Amino acid sequence: MRQTEITPIEMKVLMNHIYELQKGVRQMVLFTCPKQYEAYATKRLCSQNMDFVLQPAGKNNLNFYIGCKECLNAIRLIVTRPLNELTPEEDFILGTMLGYDLCAQCERYCERKTACKGRCDKCQHAQ
């Protein structure tokens, strides 16, 4: 009897992201997974010739930014600390790069920017 390998849901999500990137549905994705899947995810991305940037996401997770080199070069400059510490401007740029709804990103930016008026911890790095 042949034994089938069970693929964790996180890896199914990764495979879907790879498919969408290869088909041109998306230009860049952010994939978050538990650290235990780092080797599998890295091997899969490399086998598909996908460029990516890997960053820690808390104690137990990793963020894989996957996409074209130009976008990933920008990610390396913009995302230099945990996502919850990004300035409203950095958060807006990242969301837009990831293809999130532009109007929703504008609304989120305005809410974040006016809520703290540059005086809270989240805006400490704002220029």
How would you label these PLM feature ranges?
Residues 1-127:
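Domain-length accessory/inserted modules outside core catalytic folds
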